[in-house]
Design a protein with these regions (language model features):
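Hydrophobic anchor at the beta1->P-loop junction of P-loop NTPases
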Residues: 18
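Walker A/P-loop
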Residues: 27
Length: 217
């Protein structure tokens, strides 16, 4: 597993990213973090990929249907990667320049995880694109057994009948863990209590803000 050579954003703000399987518990963590940070900071919560990609035919085909023969997965990966790059420069970076704290629900790491989990481990183009992607101040990866994640997804009324490729979920979990380790991320097991998980997130965020604030002034 190669490390992504992302660019430092060099702004007054802070970028924190949250990645993991659907049902890993990241939404609970980032929602609570946003609420706490807003007491003292300007906070902007965003999501990748954007709705422009999420509502596209190719994205919905891969998310909701077992038959993927209509598309080459690379085409979706390229679409998602370009969307993340554009979103970073047009949405995230201006917020960081203002000194805001940006929390991103998923980030470029998810693009890499999905590409590799589908068998494209030797595709180097994604590493080239990563050079233009801003490096987070802290990247959180939330790990949970696949069965637990799927059970959580199925408990949502709108997704109880959603198609889920179980084999893919196992591969994705492995990729997320590898990407986290290769890129200096923070790995948190959401099998632990919500309180323990959140305390780990908050502790790291507070450490980063404290250590970097003077350097950014």
């Amino acid at each position: 597993m190669k490390k992504l050579d992302m660019k430092p954003h060099g702004t007054k703000g802070f970028l924190f990213t949250f990645c993991g399987l659907d049902g890993c518990g990241k939404t609970t963590m980032l929602t609570r973090l946003k609420s706490d940070l807003e007491k003292e900071h300007r906070v902007f919560l965003t999501k990748q990929p954007t709705n422009a990609v999420r509502t596209s035919d190719i994205f919905r085909t891969y998310m909701d249907c077992p038959d993927h023969d209509a598309y080459d997965y690379r085409s979706l990966s390229l679409l998602a990667a370009s969307d993340r790059l554009q979103h970073g420069s047009r949405v995230i970076e201006p917020r960081l320049n203002k000194g805001d704290i940006v929390i991103s629900d998923r980030y470029f790491y998810s693009c890499l995880a999905n590409l590799r989990a589908r068998g494209f481990e030797n595709d180097n183009w994604i590493y080239e694109i990563a050079r233009a992607v801003m490096k987070p101040d802290a990247a959180f990866f939330f790990d949970v057994p696949v069965e637990t994640a799927v059970k959580r997804v199925r408990s949502r009324a709108a997704e109880k009948n959603r198609y889920i490729d179980m084999d893919l979920q196992y591969r994705l979990r492995t990729e997320y863990i590898s990407i986290c380790k290769a890129n200096g991320g923070v790995l948190i097991s959401t099998e632990n209590s919500v309180e323990d998980c959140y305390n780990a997130v908050k502790k790291e965020v507070e450490r980063v803000i404290k250590n970097e604030t003077g350097k950014k002034d």
